[in-house]
Amino acid sequence: MDKIVLEGCRFYGYHGAFKEEQTLGQIFLVDLELSVDLQAASLSDQLTDTVHYGMVFDSVRQLVEGEKFILIERLAGAICEQLFNEFPPIEAIKVAIKKENPPIAGHYKAVGIELERQR
């Protein structure tokens, strides 16, 4: 299956189980892999034959920056639901969400989740 990839999208949101996360917020890193049939676009060179990744980015940004969830698992699920609703050609989605600075003690690069859904 063909794929559209958005990697390293950075958004500021207020998601998390800790009160600090819900009041102060933090940066969320989002990676998306969208399974889409790109055959027509590869032949036509027409934007109408693909999923516009700029519109995908805006859709995800509105959700991450406009909503508030306790779990990033739920945020990832909401991203999948929204993208399936807004972009019918998407057949499957893989979304990874990472927090670089959650309020937990320890040394790490990031913590996060990865979720895969099919239509």
From Swiss-Prot:
Keyword line: Folate biosynthesis, Lyase
GO cellular component terms attached to this protein's record: cytoplasm
A GO MF term: dihydroneopterin aldolase activity
Pathway noted in the entry: Cofactor biosynthesis; tetrahydrofolate biosynthesis; 2-amino-4-hydroxy-6-hydroxymethyl-7,8-dihydropteridine diphosphate from 7,8-dihydroneopterin triphosphate: step 3/4
Gene3D superfamilies, alphabetized: 3.30.1130.10
InterPro entries assigned to the protein according to its UniProt record, in alphabetical order: Dihydroneopterin_aldolase, FolB_dom, GTP-CH-I_C/QueF
Catalytic residues (positions): 99
SUPFAM superfamilies, alphabetized: Tetrahydrobiopterin biosynthesis enzymes-like (SSF55620)
A Pfam cross-reference name: FolB
EC class (word): lyase
Record-linked SMART domains: FolB
GO biological process: folic acid biosynthetic process; tetrahydrofolate biosynthetic process
Catalytic activity, reaction form: 7,8-dihydroneopterin = 6-hydroxymethyl-7,8-dihydropterin + glycolaldehyde
Binding positions for substrate per the UniProt entry: 21, 53, 72-73
Highest taxon of source: Bacteria
The keyword NADP appears for this protein: no
Protein EC: 4.1.2.25
Function: Catalyzes the conversion of 7,8-dihydroneopterin to 6-hydroxymethyl-7,8-dihydropterin.
Record-stated family: Belongs to the DHNA family.
Protein name per its UniProtKB record: Dihydroneopterin aldolase
Gene: folB
